[in-house]
Amino acid sequence: MPRASPTTKLDPRQVLTGAVLRASALLEITQSGLAQILGLSPSTVSRMANGTYTLDVQKKEWELGALFVRLFRSLDALIGSNDPAARGWLNAQNRGLVGRPIDLIRSTEGLVRVVQYLDSARGRI
């Protein structure tokens, strides 16, 4: 894998957009599901996947994308890079959250709750 040289300036929009797309792929979240999570249209997420749209740092989609990546990273740290287990956790009923995380993260409030839940679980290990 090529490494960026110290003088290479990475575009934060491309970095976050790529991280969001990779996390959604590993968690097997559809483009329409990702659109709901980010508050975007399915066609905008399709353009993201095609590389013709990047998340806008001035819009809410940026914050939601950053939260989604944080959710993925927290879940990855807790489960140990076991993608099938992460998908299972995301799709299973969770008593602590009173719902399935995959359903909850489709709203801003639910996404924040799931991230806080994972953060608190990480704090215990």
What residues fall within each predicted segment?
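Non-transmembrane "mature" sequence context
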Residues: 1-125
